[in-house]
Amino acid sequence: MRIGISPFATTQETALELSRIAVEGGLDTLWLGDGYLANPDFTGWAGAMESLAELAWLAGRYPTARVGIAAAILPLRDPSWLAKQANTLHRMAGGGFVLVVTPGFWAHDLEARGIAFADRAAVFDASLADLRRLLPDETLSPGPSSTGPPPVWLAGAAATMARAAALGLPFLSSRATPDELGPIARRFFDAGGEFLAHRTRLEYGEHDVTGNVVDWHAITGSAGEFVDTLGRYAELGVGDLSIIPGQDDAGSLRTVEILAAEVMPQL
């Protein structure tokens, strides 16, 4: 199971430090989410920046890292321009960019751009077809790299998971403990799904993790408990794990340091 983090922090300097510790400690993928309007659970360097721009910056600072967006709200993005951005970033990251796309979770983001929340699935399906056609298109500038375009994964709820299984695309689930993920993973694989990834919030220590609008389903605990939790995700068939280690300098640093120094050597 491949493991990476979102370098969420209070300051730009700590976002860089988190990335350094992670990459040097074997947490080799740097993930960012996506959003349009201000969200009290994703502020500043903890998820508010434009994701593709920040990922390009991180790819330049840490050229051995894989980078990924989890997940781009596809109905809010022009597929032609996203294909250009994705192929560019894939080249900048040495062939190490993962493009995860979703129909969208926040109604206000979509409605602010004139898209009814109920229409997002239809818009997503049309845009996904366009995106998959455009990414390998050699007439675009830049077209795909010599190793091909970046991989496309899907993220979302049950309907999107079914799309992923039907299309043979990887699916990224999110915000579920191993117990909660178990039945989801079984449904995905029973439907013919081929590759399951997961995004979760994992923080060192014993404390409650609450959000303003996000129900995190966060996992907290010791290094030993982390080893057990990550092992359980792997047993469920998760092939790629994206960890949100916190949303401030102190909490994120503490968690990433423990993951790199004590957890990864045991996996």
Give each language-model segment a name.
Residues 1-267:
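Active-site-adjacent structural elements that line small-molecule/cofactor binding pockets in enzymes
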